[in-house]
Amino acid sequence: MTILFLTMVISYFGCMKAAPMKEASVRGQGSLAYPGVRTHGTLESVSGPKAGSRGLTSLADTFEHVIEELLDEDQKVRPNEENNKDADLYTSRVMLSSQVPLEPPLLFLLEEYKNYLDAANMSMRVRRHSDPARRGELSVCDSISEWVTAADKKTAVDMSGGTVTVLEKVPVSKGQLKQYFYETKCNPMGYTKEGCRGIDKRHWNSQCRTTQSYVRALTMDSKKRIGWRFIRIDTSCVCTLTIKRGR
């Protein structure tokens, strides 16, 4: 599992010339990308100039150490979602890249790796019974996730309720990078398009609906003013219920 994760991380950094987030304290403020950003460094700059000579085991240890530090730091700066109504502003669904990203956002991979570390501390029997596939678990609503560009979105709604134009390219020191958004929405071809899975239709009306959150993107308003604004994008598929009357 560790080797698989490292392969995903290496391919993630290798295939993209993407703008990195700023330090963790800035990420806690919902900042995702800014003008003048730089491209990702190489593995050498992350692990040191002699990392390759120490072999794959040393490289794996280095990545695990860095990832665990990132997860610890992320827990420190993550807002308290119960007390902060703006918690959905903190997202990692925006990427600046010269080509379509081949993997989900890095923080999504970190979350998966965190779950892997938690599972590693379980006994084999506990892991076997905690596997959703073994328990026959299914999602209440079927969803799909994919990277989309500003060319696909064209316009979006900002925090003031106004419609803004999403700019396709962002100027950086060495040229331009495209804005990509990782969107999650209800699957129109899924089995839950007629209602949520597992809901008693005798007593409830159900519907799978796409919900949105705010992310920061480079946009232009109706007065041709260009700037970084929070816009709404599709981020999840949830089940909504209404009770049937007259029963």
UniProtKB/Swiss-Prot annotation:
Post-translational modification: Mature BDNF is produced by proteolytic removal of the propeptide, catalyzed by a FURIN family member. In addition, the precursor form is proteolytically cleaved within the propeptide, but this is not an obligatory intermediate for the production of mature BDNF. Can be converted into mature BDNF by plasmin (PLG).
Major place of residence: secreted
A GO biological process held by the record: negative regulation of neuron apoptotic process
Glycan attachment residues as annotated in the record: 121
PANTHER family given in the database record: BRAIN-DERIVED NEUROTROPHIC FACTOR, NERVE GROWTH FACTOR NGF -RELATED
Similarity annotation: Belongs to the NGF-beta family.
Disulfide bond positions: 141-208, 186-237, 196-239
Protein name: Neurotrophic factor BDNF precursor form
Organism: Canis lupus familiaris
Function: Important signaling molecule that activates signaling cascades downstream of NTRK2. During development, promotes the survival and differentiation of selected neuronal populations of the peripheral and central nervous systems. Participates in axonal growth, pathfinding and in the modulation of dendritic growth and morphology. Major regulator of synaptic transmission and plasticity at adult synapses in many regions of the CNS.
Annotated SMART domains: NGF (SM00140)
The keyword Signal belongs to this UniProt entry's keyword annotation: yes
Subunit description: Monomers and homodimers. Binds to NTRK2/TRKB. Can form heterodimers with other neurotrophin family members, such as NTF3 and NTF4 (in vitro), but the physiological relevance of this is not clear. BDNF precursor form: interacts with the heterodimer formed by NGFR and SORCS2. Mature BDNF has much lower affinity for the heterodimer formed by NGFR and SORCS2.
Site, as annotated: Cleavage: 57-58
Record keywords: Cleavage on pair of basic residues, Disulfide bond, Glycoprotein, Growth factor, Secreted, Signal
Location(s), subcellular: Secreted
Gene3D superfamilies hit by this protein: Cystine-knot cytokines
Signal peptide as annotated in the record: 1-18
GO CC annotation, single: axon
UniProt superkingdom: Eukaryota
GO molecular function ontology, one term from the record: growth factor activity
Propeptide: 19-128
